[in-house]
Amino acid sequence: MRCPFCAAEETKVVDSRLAADGYQIRRRRECTSCKERFTTFESAELVVPYVIKNNGNRVPSDANKLRVSLSRALEKRPVSADDLEKAISKIIIQLQSTGEREVPSKLVGSLAMDALKQLDKVAYIRFASVYLSFDDIEEFTKEIEKLRE
């Protein structure tokens, strides 16, 4: 791998360890020419399926859109950014593991709701109220009762 500092072609791996719950390898490298050190991450390249929207449109999976949606539900809740990123990674891995080239948006929403249910019940209700299009307080109450079971 080329050195990002001096563009020399020779670098050596100084340290390797697992990262991202074992789905990546983090490597510390050292340039043999300039002796600068830098970090690289290695992961399997898996195809993330397209999402089929309710209107039939097909769009690429978008981790940032998922991050924004989950972050909005988790706003001012005691959930770390690291836990959020782990949840997003888990959802993406679940989508990849379907082996499908296209998945319905309902699957993405369902996986997001499952993740939020594990992270924070209040965030789950916030997300569900939008995702399930709650019209009145009764629908909130029913969903809260499901959580209590």
From Swiss-Prot:
One protein family per Pfam: Zn_ribbon_NrdR
Stretches that traverse the bilayer: none
Comment on bound cofactor: Binds 1 zinc ion.
An example Gene Ontology biological process: negative regulation of DNA-templated transcription
Keywords: ATP-binding, DNA-binding, Metal-binding, Nucleotide-binding, Repressor, Transcription, Transcription regulation, Zinc, Zinc-finger
PROSITE patterns hit by this protein: ATP_CONE
KW GTP-binding (keyword) present: no
Chain ranges of the ATP-cone domain: 49-139
Cofactor(s) named in the record: Zn(2+)
Chain's role: Negatively regulates transcription of bacterial ribonucleotide reductase nrd genes and operons by binding to NrdR-boxes.
Name of this chain's protein: Transcriptional repressor NrdR
Organism: Actinobacillus pleuropneumoniae serotype 3 (strain JL03)
Gene that specifies this protein: nrdR
